[in-house]
Amino acid sequence: VTVVEHGEHLMSAEDAAVSREIEAVFAEEGIATELGAKVRSAKAKKGGVAVRLADDRDIEGSHLLVATGRRPNTDDLGCEAAGIELDERAFVLTGEHYETSAENVFAVGDASGSPQFTHVAWDDHRLLFDRLMGRTIRARSSRSYPYVAFTDPEVAGVGLNEKRARERSIPYDLATIPFSSLNRAYETGENKGVLRVLVDPGSDRVLGASIVGAQAGELIHCFVVLMEAKATIDAIVNAEFAHPTFAEGVQSVVMALERRSK
């Protein structure tokens, strides 16, 4: 298997430290990666396919999978006739409360331009339902939604990473530990990965977290709850975590903050 990626790293939205963990695993498993590469052409050949890169190198294989992203399936919804405006990518334009340009018409889920995850679409419908029923309204823009790549090991995140924090000039303190430092990881042999957390230096609240490792998709929800509760990292530091568990890593990475380790 060869993965051709035009970005400098796989999973280019992640911090380089996260991407490198997956790249290292791929390399160990014999998966080749062509990073910073562009495809010039692709053609069928006997028994497979050949791809030519911009530097004139050829990659041959039995099958070719092209991943170019998604587009909304709004062509046949009758949006124009209903007076519902779309953006330049054909997503339905919505406001903070999912309202469209047509009175009393709302849009939730993938077509509304929300992050395209099933769990986000589910939460969209809950937020809209609460609003329509006159219940307490949570803010759409301030929610903390997790995401998981079900690779092996898994990659999970919530909130800001270093890349996004720097782009927005948001100050942060960073703590990071290798997944191999967890006793449970050592015992099970699932020791590849890293845990990273960004904390607001003023409020001690979590700005975001990234995890690569076994059960990362489960562990990230510790930070999701912490962020939704607007609690400080003391809630993690003072909690009792069963030993030996992967969840101990959540506490360990927070306690690795420089001001906590002194």
Residue locations for each model-derived region?
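FAD-site-proximal beta/loop scaffold in flavoenzymes
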Residues: 58-133
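Short acidic-glycine loop/turn motifs at beta-strand connectors
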Residues: 45-46, 88, 201-203
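Flexible, glycine-rich terminal cap/loop adjacent to redox cofactors
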Residues: 134, 138, 150-262
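Rossmann-like dinucleotide-binding cores of NAD(P)H-dependent redox enzymes
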Residues: 1-50, 55, 115-122, 130-164
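Conserved N-terminal phosphate-binding loop of PLP-dependent enzymes in the Aspartate aminotransferase
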Residues: 30, 93, 197-199
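Residue-level signature of catalytic and energy-coupling elements of molecular machines
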Residues: 1, 26, 79, 125, ...
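Conserved beta-strand segments of alpha/beta enzyme cores
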Residues: 32, 58, 85, 171-173
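Glycine/Thr-rich phosphate-binding loops of Rossmann-like dinucleotide-binding domains
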Residues: 11, 73-76, 115, 183-185, ...
